A protein has these predicted regions:
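Pyridoxal 5′-phosphate
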Residues: 1-420
Length: 420
């Protein structure tokens, strides 16, 4: 084991981008260097994103969509340019109509549940979900089950932490909607989404993809994926909080009623009714998150300058390093939940250290400047499948490197000694 540890330790490289791009990473915690390993919960923001938002507020702040004075037109151009950037980033055929700005991925999924599913599904209809879904892609469907009597059918995971697709065609029999993640926020597993989508469409089902974890880390193209809807959040991809994206096929979005009512989403209002605006406006009621859209556009610019293939390659190198160093250091005392190796896997390491509760572990790591998340990670059905109440999770991004993992492992050793 020691030989493996020494061999692994020599395979190191720098972060994919300069840490100096991220102001928060310059600070210390408990008189130690900050080691941020919680990007699956929320990523840090580069200076370019912060500057873009500041520049908007300092020079172009006004409400969008109706102002005819100069700065209002500037704000409008910035907002719609961000929409175009996002559309290009995910391969949307018609971003001007199909890219809807919302609060976050959770709200995007709820738009589909309330505006599409509630109109197209009825009692007894089946929605297929997976055991590895985040609550954001489970609870809206469970709510519909209570409200209108739909039924949920579950795709389980196998012992290798991948979806069991051995009986996929039978599982899809009679299914009207498939709700599936593009990457598990607990396991890091990347399911064979196109295979699932093709089988779902052959069975006559509509497919929604939860891209909250995947869009920040892998190249996502909605047409190559074969999804009908895609939801994701800005704050996990170097952008600000408070804004997310719902992409949908234009024909499906056209068939859906508005999710929220108010200003901005109407073409006409009468005493006896209203006429909604055209896409995407009918789903963007009220004053939208303008500065946040500008920040998201800047985050897209930053990621595109890196290249998404390089991002996932970097993540996987760190996963491989972590797996090997952890095995060499802790053996069976550290259990990692997720596929071994890097095939079909993203930069998430959820773990259980023998004899240490995940919350205690996270608190000890914090004393060494290491930021990880502990809990059920909004995935309680998956936790029950894994047989644990909670797990500690480290997650990687473009600003991490092997030195961060060395700091994590050193802090884990301290925790093992403390509770041993």
């Amino acid at each position: 084991m020691a030989e493996l540890r020494n061999e692994v330790a020599t395979v190191k490289s720098a972060p994919l981008v300069p840490r100096e791009d991220f102001p928060l990473l310059e600070r210390t915690v408990h008189d130690r260097r900050l080691v941020y390993l919680d990007s699956s919960a929320s990523a840090q923001r580069p200076r370019s994103v912060l500057d873009a938002m500041d520049d908007y507020y300092e020079h172009s702040h006004a409400n969008v969509h109706r102002g005819v004075y100069a700065i209002a037109e500037e704000a409008d151009a910035l907002y719609e340019n961000a929409r175009r950037k996002v559309g290009r980033f995910i391969g949307a055929p018609n971003p001007a109509a199909e890219v809807i700005f919302c609060k976050n991925a959770t709200e995007g999924i709820n738009v589909v549940a309330n505006s599409w599913a509630s109109r197209h599904l009825s009692a007894g209809d089946v929605v297929l979900v997976t055991e590895m879904e985040h609550h954001a892609n489970l609870v809206p469907w469970l709510m519909l089950a209570e409200q209108i009597g739909i039924e949920l059918r579950w795709l389980d995971i196998d012992d290798d932490f991948r979806l069991d697709l051995s009986d996929l065609d039978r599982m899809l029999d009679g299914v009207k909607l498939v709700a599936c993640t593009l990457m598990s926020n607990v396991l890091g597993t990347i399911p064979p989404f196109r295979r699932i989508a093709d089988a779902a469409h052959a069975a006559g089902a509509v497919v929604i993809a939860d891209g909250a974890q995947a869009v920040p880390h892998i190249a996502v193209d909605v047409e190559r994926l074969g999804c009908d809807f895609l939801a994701f959040s800005a704050h996990k991809m170097l952008g600000p909080t408070g804004i997310g994206v719902l992409w949908g096929r234009e024909d499906l979005l056209e068939s859906m009623p508005p999710f929220l009512g108010g200003g901005g989403m109407i073409r006409d209002v009468r005493k006896d009714g209203f006429t909604p605006s055209e896409l995407p406006g009918k789903f963007e009621a009220g004053t939208p998150p303008i500065a946040e859209a500008v920040g998201l556009g800047a985050a897209v610019d930053y990621l595109e300058a890196i290249g998404m293939d390089r991002v996932i390659e970097h993540d996987r190198r760190l996963v491989s390093y972590t797996q090997e160093v952890a095995a060499a250091t802790f053996g069976e005392d550290l259990r990692i939940f997720g596929p071994y190796g890097t095939e079909d896997r993203g930069g998430v390491i959820s773990m259980e250290l023998k004899g240490v509760h995940p919350h205690d572990l996270a608190q000890v790591l914090d004393q060494y400047g290491v930021c990880v998340r502990a809990g059920h990670h909004c995935a309680k059905p998956l936790m029950r499948r894994l047989g644990v109440p909670a797990a500690a999770r480290a997650s990687f991004y473009v600003y991490n490197d092997e030195s961060d993992i060395d700091a994590l492992v050193a802090a884990l050793k301290e925790a093992a000694t403390l509770f041993g």
